[in-house]
């Protein structure tokens, strides 16, 4: 009815729900490719993606239809199509009368080379880029996983990864290939380890995915201890050996390490990080079906075991390229002449990752060549963040880096040289109003995960002997607390102490200080919620930290919960 044809692109702007799952399957059945939109990202970024992708239509519901206000694109509102007692729909939704629907809608024949989905990732040029993946590519990945791990109707899968990340593809479609149940987590539940552990126990989930940093937070949650599952998969970041060992000490499950970029249908290699594995570092392992891993030097020649080179990927799972960007596709997807006299040219993807062969034939990840980083599982091009800051009228020059904080986590920090005709200033400039203005500007253009935790204003960016910017010489940010009103009540002091400890602050914050403005992020928020839950004895949720991020407000909320529990007894 919306005129969708095979090979069309249909954008989707829905919260995670059964309604979202069915919408994606409906798009596939219509022969189109789905393009997931992050409904929490700024409207300006959504508009840029829609302008670049030119979808046939956008699927929305009553909670997201306002996102398209002012956009020149058709939409399909599925609010009335599903009757679901779930956040994606309610029991009072008015479902259409079956008599009003066509009795038999002819379904198109989908070719293996047709696009299955388009996922936008961060772009180094300042614009996100859409990766086009075919049915041929993703079906290879799904069938490999089904057969390699022996999944079938007896397993229960959890869909918790946001659908704008490619891990969600196997969570959404592999259960259907296996005839297995799919448990759909409520929106934002993937951020809350306590709620996640409860859901896994309640629903009997036995196949689940974690980004390693989130797995660490999950293992910190007391409710996770002793969980029994068939398989836990990790990807998106390097899996540290100590985390593997800690996992096996707390949980009864197989642990698998997967690796792959969005440009190669989710994952291209695997490693069994089981109880007997003693690898350190843990390798990314061996290739999946019909896939080649190639470690090449600067002249595109294979390197011997133990020598670090650039990892190139080949085979059936390679993406078609970047939507509407033939220049970028040609730069990253190369045609290699082959590795022998009788070899024919082959198409390879330049991953930008450094790697080396182990003696046993497994591949070991060694870092990145460029300024791309993985932050809590999300691939981020620092160039896109720098481009956003550059559009602020007071920004003359900017550099963004990911710094390791005192707790071992990564935080994005922006270093900005402001426009100024004034006399020479100190190396680091103190202008809180300008720093906050720059951050506010970035929030209108970037997803929350890409907004830096801090802005450092500098008179000039450091230069090394060769005349290039010296990123290693950029100073560490100081997350200054406001402390206009110091914590006074016992509960305020407890919350302030937890803020200071978890964020590594040099002094205790005041009651107006905001956890996230002081450098906090979602994973640190899970630690804060767990700490205060243990100390206060109340069921403090992760959502409460996001709703009451200031010391005083969070302390007042905890006191309210304590009074409520006291009244109940």
Positions of the model-derived regions?
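Phosphopantetheine-attachment site and its flanking helix in carrier
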Residues: 17-28, 380-384, 396, 469, ...
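Short acidic/glycine-enriched loop/turn segments that link adjacent beta-strands
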Residues: 166, 263, 406-410, 548
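Phosphate-binding active sites in nucleotide-utilizing proteins
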Residues: 6, 33, 519
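AMP-dependent adenylate-forming
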Residues: 42-43, 57-108, 138, 253-257, ...
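Active-site/ligand-binding surface loops and adjacent short beta/alpha elements
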Residues: 14
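Gly/Thr-rich phosphate-binding loop signature of adenosyl cofactor/nucleotide-binding cores
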Residues: 10
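Motif- and composition-driven signal specific to adenylation
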Residues: 19-25, 32-51, 55, 61, ...
């Amino acid at each position: 009815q919306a005129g969708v044809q095979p090979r069309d692109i249909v954008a989707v702007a829905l919260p995670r729900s059964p309604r979202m799952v069915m919408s994606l399957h409906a798009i596939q059945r219509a022969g189109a490719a789905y393009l997931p939109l992050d409904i929490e990202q700024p409207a300006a970024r959504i508009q840029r993606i829609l302008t670049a992708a030119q979808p046939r239509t956008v699927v929305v519901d009553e909670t997201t239809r306002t996102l398209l206000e002012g956009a020149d694109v058709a939409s399909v509102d599925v609010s009335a199509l599903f009757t679901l007692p779930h956040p994606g729909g309610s029991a009072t939704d008015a479902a259409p009368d079956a008599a009003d629907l066509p009795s038999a809608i002819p379904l198109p024949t989908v070719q293996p080379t047709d696009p299955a989905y388009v996922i936008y990732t961060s772009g180094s040029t300042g614009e996100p880029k859409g990766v086009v993946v075919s049915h041929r590519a993703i079906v290879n990945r799904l069938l490999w996983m089904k057969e390699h791990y022996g999944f079938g109707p007896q397993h229960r899968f959890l869909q918790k990864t946001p659908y704008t990340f490619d891990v969600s593809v196997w969570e959404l479609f592999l259960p259907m290939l296996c005839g297995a149940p799919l448990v759909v987590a409520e929106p934002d539940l993937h951020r809350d380890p306590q709620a996640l552990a409860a859901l896994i126990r309640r629903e009997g989930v036995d196949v689940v995915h974690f980004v390693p940093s989130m797995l660490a937070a999950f293992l910190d949650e007391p409710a996770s201890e002793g969980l029994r599952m068939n398989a836990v998969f990790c990807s998106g970041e390097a899996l540290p050996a100590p985390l593997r060992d800690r996992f096996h000490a707390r949980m009864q499950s197989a642990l698998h390490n997967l690796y792959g970029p969005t440009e190669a249908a989710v994952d291209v290699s695997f490693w069994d990080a089981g109880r007997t594995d003693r690898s350190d570092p843990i390798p990314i392992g061996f290739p999946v079906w019909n896939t080649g891993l190639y470690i090449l030097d600067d002249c595109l020649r294979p390197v011997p075991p133990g020598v670090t080179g650039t990892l190139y990927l080949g085979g059936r799972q390679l993406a078609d390229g970047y939507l509407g960007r033939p220049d970028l596709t040609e730069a990253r997807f190369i045609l290699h002449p082959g590795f022998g006299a009788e070899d024919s040219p082959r198409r390879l993807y330049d991953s930008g990752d450094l790697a080396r062969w182990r003696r046993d034939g497994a591949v070991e990840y060694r870092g990145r060549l460029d300024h791309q980083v993985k932050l809590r599982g999300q691939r981020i091009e620092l160039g896109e963040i720098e481009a956003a800051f550059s559009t602020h009228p007071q920004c003359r020059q900017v550099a963004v880096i990911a710094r390791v904080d005192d707790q071992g986590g990564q935080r994005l920090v922006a270093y900005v040289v402001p426009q100024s005709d004034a006399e020479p200033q100190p190396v680091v400039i103190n202008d809180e109003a300008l720093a906050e203005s720059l951050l506010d500007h970035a929030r209108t253009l970037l997803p929350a995960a890409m907004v830096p935790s801090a802005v450092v204003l500098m008179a000039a960016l450091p230069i090394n002997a060769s005349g290039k910017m010296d990123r290693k010489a950029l100073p560490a940010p100081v997350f200054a607390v406001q402390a206009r009103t110091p914590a006074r009540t016992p509960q305020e002091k407890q919350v302030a102490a937890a803020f200071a400890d978890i964020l590594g602050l040099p002094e205790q914050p005041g009651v107006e200080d905001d956890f996230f403005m002081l450098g906090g992020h979602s994973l640190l928020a899970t630690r804060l919620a767990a700490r205060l839950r243990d100390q206060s004895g109340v069921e403090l949720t992760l959502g409460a930290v996001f709703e009451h991020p200031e010391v005083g407000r969070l302390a007042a909320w905890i006191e309210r919960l304590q009074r409520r529990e006291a009244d109940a007894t």
